[in-house]
């Protein structure tokens, strides 16, 4: 913890707190490397954005020179590993109460050393009020930006870059949040910003929008009238009162006016006929809770009706709501959603945003950074440094509520290359990567959260073992353990905190936390050793395959693919075997496989297809290093090449578990080419192309792939997609519909999942699909 700001006397009301203790490692991370700033100051909350460079360790591989050596008998590693420092770009967003603003500015001033700019972009109603204070403290010139332009730029940015950013609120569901998949075409839409008043904007493109309406009755009205009615001055306390109120004690309902005759009008008797109608005639005192609830309903219903009236003439069916009025409060989202559904008769969808509070700050930052072209990159949410969507529902326990109104964080990492859809997706807007939504499935959620928690000891042990020469590896590993454990506890209480909860998001969060504490590739030495062993076995495996008849060889190739997929250090059932039995190899893995018929078995259809004309080009998403890629995937690739099929072999851009990376695949392919003329000529003639996916995940999102890979798929006319492994073909993409033939194959290495699918440990999925005509 560090002192933030000079000590001073206590403050209250609108005065600024100058004596606040902040944890800078958690709040203002990488501030010393901040290059550019933006700030959005509202009536009660400040949102700060800054761009910084982050230095972290990465594991690099480089091929040895094996010229003139006998590679079959050469027991040296196939490549060397070095850990290097790499600098990447990161966006930081921090949200805090205006009470903290002077203390935070003092802290920033004391720690700001490398900024490249003399200007800070500012937006929001408080930009004018605090202009002099900001310029005095930071010695940066304040450039004020248009509020609406910033909001729209920010909204477009999060919808494009953050999967599961938008959600609908359904009060009777468990959980109430239903997240939307990223739509490749987000325009047009209606943005309703509820600040002090209401602004309604039609957004047509990234640069074109039109203000179409608004109202003076908005969040400020709720706050102001609420303060008069309840004597409660704080906005969140008003919402807390409303959540405990019963509006029908104050409002006149339809049944109060029409009695039983309301049914002939086609109206529900519970509809509000007159807000605060009973207060004019009832001779009684109304509770603060009931009045706050009635006021919230009145304003939310008005906003919902206005949104519908403006959406319909423009034929818009999606309305995004933002502004300080919402703040993720369930009672607010519930009333707005009900209003939209009622007045639109279900034709218009009310959508809320996980990061709606940051839109203005994000937009202001983008305005100031236009010369750096931030929109030409793709960005990804860093789960390790983000606090997530923390509901302020009064039903939550005090541990969860305590975070409301303090500091919330969002971090986004700039990715090396733009990410786009796989061109072969049948219907990109309806594509959902994940097979099971753990926010929906309570039993699966409980199992997987416990599974990842119980695996922590092994992950920590592996991380420490990967850096034997580091004096602080154990200390950093314990910090990783604590951070990831805390994330898991948050997700137990609030599974919606980072969007849709899935096995993929749990795996990705773990990878982010490992990277946070400089464990870039804990399995690098394991992969190096296993690649070396598998390369020495490759010639013998190929000779035995070539000796088989054609039909027998096809089955052997598929079994080789499946046996290779057994070697997954992310599966406890496998890692236990590999650690206890160092001699466990390719043949032993084959004997572990389920006998045919498999759990999902389309092999006969695949064999029949192979008797037809060859495919033009196959896109193969590989899984693990070592035996999997070398003895399973490459013989399969070789057979396709012999049939006259071009092959695009796609591997992870960065490390995750023991998955093969693009840089490792290049070295492996080079070594195999030295042993096999088929692979050698295919590489030379560019009939075999090795590309990176743009991902560093054990799973696969076909809507976020490297732009170069997508271009190559179009250029080569790929007509077969092969997806291998549990993470890529079962946890994700099992139901993915493609416009071409596909193979999804995996060995189920988790007993609980196998039983749930109707099988047993090491059951086989071999799913061959042909698109409908």
Curated annotation (Swiss-Prot):
Residues 2-402 are annotated as: Pantothenate kinase. Acetyl-CoA binds at residues 196, 199. Activity is strongly promoted by Co(2+), Ni(2+), Mg(2+) and Mn(2+). Activity is inhibited by EDTA. This is 4'-phosphopantetheine phosphatase. It comes from the Eukaryota. One of its GO terms (biological process) is coenzyme A biosynthetic process. The modification Phosphothreonine is found at residue 406. GO terms for molecular function: ATP binding; hydrolase activity; metal ion binding; pantothenate kinase activity. The modification Phosphoserine is found at residues 393, 404.
């Amino acid at each position: 913890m560090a002192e933030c700001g000079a000590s001073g006397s206590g403050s209250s009301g609108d005065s600024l707190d100058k004596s606040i203790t902040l944890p800078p490692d958690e709040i203002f991370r990488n501030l010393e490397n901040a290059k550019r700033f933006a700030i959005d100051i509202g009536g009660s909350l400040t949102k700060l954005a800054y761009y910084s460079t982050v230095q972290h360790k990465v594991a690099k591989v480089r091929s040895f020179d094996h010229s003139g050596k006998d590679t079959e008998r050469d027991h040296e590693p196939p490549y060397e590993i070095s850990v290097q420092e790499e600098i990447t770009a990161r966006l930081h967003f921090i949200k805090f109460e205006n009470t903290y603003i002077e203390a935070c500015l003092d802290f920033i001033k004391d720690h700001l050393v490398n900024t490249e700019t003399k200007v800070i972009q500012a937006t929001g109603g408080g930009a004018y009020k605090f202009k002099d204070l900001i310029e005095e403290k930071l010695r940066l010139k304040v450039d004020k930006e248009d509020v609406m332009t910033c909001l729209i730029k920010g909204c477009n940015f999060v919808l494009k870059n953050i999967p599961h950013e938008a959600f609908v609120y359904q009060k009777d569901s468990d959980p109430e949040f239903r997240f939307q998949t990223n739509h490749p075409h987000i325009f047009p839409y209606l943005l309703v910003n509820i600040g002090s008043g209401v602004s309604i904007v039609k957004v047509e493109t990234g640069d074109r929008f039109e203000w179409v309406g608004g109202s003076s009755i908005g969040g400020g009205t709720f706050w102001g009238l609420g303060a008069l009615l309840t004597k409660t001055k704080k906005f969140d306390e008003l919402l807390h009162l409303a959540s405990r109120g019963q509006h029908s004690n104050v409002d006149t309902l339809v049944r109060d006016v029409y009695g039983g005759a309301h049914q002939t009008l086609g109206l529900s008797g519970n509809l509000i006929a007159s807000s605060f109608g009973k207060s004019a005639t009832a001779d009684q005192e109304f509770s603060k809770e009931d009045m706050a609830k009635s006021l919230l309903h009145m304003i939310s219903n008005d906003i919902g009706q206005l949104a519908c009236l403006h959406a319909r003439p423009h034929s818009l069916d999606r309305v995004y709501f933002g502004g300080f009025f919402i703040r993720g409060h369930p009672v607010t989202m519930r009333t707005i959603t009900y209003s939209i559904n009622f007045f639109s008769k279900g034709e218009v969808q009310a959508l809320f945003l996980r990061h709606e509070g940051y839109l203005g700050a994000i937009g202001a930052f983008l305005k100031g950074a236009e010369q750096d072209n931030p929109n030409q990159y793709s960005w990804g949410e860093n789960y390790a440094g983000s606090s997530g969507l923390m509901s302020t529902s009064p039903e939550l326990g005090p541990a969860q509520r305590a975070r409301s109104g303090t500091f919330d964080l969002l971090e986004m990492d700039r990715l090396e290359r733009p990410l786009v859809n796989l061109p072969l997706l049948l219907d990109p807007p309806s594509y959902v990567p994940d097979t099971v939504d753990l926010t929906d499935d309570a039993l699966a959620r409980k199992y997987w959260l416990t599974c990842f928690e119980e695996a922590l000891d092994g992950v920590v042990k592996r991380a420490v073992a990967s850096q034997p020469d580091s004096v602080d590896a154990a200390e950093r590993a314990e910090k990783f353990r604590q951070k990831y454990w805390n994330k898991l506890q948050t997700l137990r209480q609030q599974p919606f905190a980072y969007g849709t909860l899935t096995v993929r998001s749990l795996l990705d969060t773990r990878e982010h936390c490992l990277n946070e504490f400089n464990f870039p590739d804990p399995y690098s030495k394991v992969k190096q050793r296993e690649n070396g062993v598998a390369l020495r076995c490759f010639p013998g495996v190929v000779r035995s395959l070539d000796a088989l008849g054609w039909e027998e060889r096809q089955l052997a190739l598929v079994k080789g693919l499946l046996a290779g997929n057994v070697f997954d250090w992310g599966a406890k059932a496998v890692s236990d075997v590999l650690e206890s039995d160092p001699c466990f190899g390719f043949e032993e893995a084959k004997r572990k496989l389920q006998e045919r018929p498999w759990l999902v078995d389309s092999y006969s259809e695949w064999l029949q297809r192979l008797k037809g004309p060859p495919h033009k080009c196959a896109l193969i998403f590989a899984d693990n290093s070592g035996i999997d890629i070398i003895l399973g995937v490459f013989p399969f690739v070789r057979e396709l090449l012999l049939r006259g099929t071009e092959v695009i072999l796609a591997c992870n851009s960065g490390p995750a578990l023991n998955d093969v990376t693009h840089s490792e695949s290049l070295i492996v392919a080079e070594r195999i080419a030295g042993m096999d003329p088929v692979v050698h000529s295919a590489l030379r003639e560019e009939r075999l192309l090795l590309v990176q996916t743009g991902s560093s995940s054990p799973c696969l999102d076909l809507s976020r792939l490297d732009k170069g890979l997508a271009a190559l798929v179009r250029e080569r006319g790929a007509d077969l997609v092969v997806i291998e492994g549990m993470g890529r073909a079962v946890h994700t993409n099992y139901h993915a519909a493609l416009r071409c033939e596909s193979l999804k194959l995996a060995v189920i290495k988790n007993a609980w999942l196998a039983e749930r699918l109707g099988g047993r440990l090491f059951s086989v999925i071999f799913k061959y699909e042909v698109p409908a005509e």
